[in-house]
Amino acid sequence: MKQLALVVLMLAATPALAGETAAVADLAWMSGSWAQETPGGTVRETWMPPYDNAMAGMTQTHRQGRPVVTEFSTITAEPAGVTFTAYLKGQPPTPFVLKPGKPGEAVFENLTHDFPQRVIYRQCDVGLCARIEGTIGGKAQGMDWRYRRLP
C-alpha cells in the first residue's frame, strides 16, 4: 500500500516538475533587433524567434562606422538543458547552460570557462539588458549592455 501511495504521489508531481523545465520558447521575449549606442561605437544584437527548440543570434560591434567584432550565438535545447552557445572567430564553441530563474530573465552559466562564466539577459526599462560576468585573476569582472529595440 505504501508503494502504491508513493507511485500515485510521483505521478501527481510529474506534471508540476515538467512545467518547471525551461524551454527555448520561454525566451521569445529576447527576439528582435536591439542596439546600444555609446561614444565609443554601436553594439547591435539580433535574435531570431524560437523555432524547433532553437534561436539564432548575432552581435556586431561597430566603431567609426565599421564592424570590428561579430559574434554568432545559438540557444538550443540540449540534454544538459537550454544552452546558449557562443561562436567566436578562432575559438571553439562555448556552451552556457540556463540556470533556473524568474520570468523575463535568463542566466546562462559555464563555471569552467575562463571569462565570462555567466551570460545574462533580462527585460528592463529600455528593452533588453545583457551582462557578462565572471572572475579574472580572482577578481570579479563584468560588462553591461542596455539595448533599445530597433524598429
Per-segment meaning from a language model:
Residues 44, 118, 144:
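Short hydrophobic/aromatic beta-strand element in the GNAT-like acyltransferase core
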Residues 30-31, 36-112:
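Central antiparallel beta-sheet cores of small beta-barrel/beta-sandwich binding domains
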